[in-house]
Amino acid sequence: MVKYSQEPGNPTKSAKAMGRDLRVHFKNTRETAFALRKLPLTKAKRYLEDVIAHKQAIPFRRYCGGVGRTAQAKSRHSNGQGRWPVKSARFILDLLKNAESNADVKGLDVDNLYVSHIQVNQAQKQRRRTYRAHGRINPYMSSPCHIELILSEKEEPVKKEADNIVAARKQ
């Protein structure tokens, strides 16, 4: 059994998916995942497809050193720094589709799902080497990551009773 960092509040109304040791940049994937937090599933999938087509940008908030500015990122409530991490978007889109099919098998309403939890962790770095001048060798590392996400059904809030009924009961 794979351990998730957070268990859903209602496991019967949730679907999970996880990817381990994925060969995709950690920093780009973290920013992509943060942009999807609390989005409905249909909007999240459409947003990632737009990122792949370069129609919408992912705003870079934490790992934004040297990242250029674009109007597409400014419209997503950031300072304007953003990119289009296509590979990260494809990996997360595949995981969203996996979690959606898991929800379908569980019998959940797919149109009512939203991304309740998404997290990206660093995986163990993979080492390669590059040869430099004067016989030196430098490391050539990759930064893979683990991605976990949970889709949950929106909880319908309990409707408040009308005031006139409450007043009638008090008398």
From Swiss-Prot:
Keyword vocabulary terms for this entry: Ribonucleoprotein, Ribosomal protein
Transmembrane residue ranges: none
One GO BP annotation of this record: cytoplasmic translation
The keyword Ribonucleoprotein is annotated on this UniProt entry: yes
Keyword Ribosomal protein in annotation: yes
A GO CC annotation given for this chain: cytosolic large ribosomal subunit
Entries under Gene3D superfamilies matching the protein: Ribosomal protein L22/L17
CDD domains in the record: Ribosomal_L22
Signal sequence segment: none
InterPro entries: Ribosomal_uL22, Ribosomal_uL22_CS, Ribosomal_uL22_euk/arc, Ribosomal_uL22_sf
MF terms in GO: structural constituent of ribosome
PANTHER family cross-referenced by the UniProt entry: 60S RIBOSOMAL PROTEIN L17, LARGE RIBOSOMAL SUBUNIT PROTEIN UL22
UniProt record similarity statement: Belongs to the universal ribosomal protein uL22 family.
HAMAP family named among the record's database cross-references: Ribosomal_uL22_A
Protein name per the record: Large ribosomal subunit protein uL22
Organism: Zea mays
Gene behind this protein: RPL17
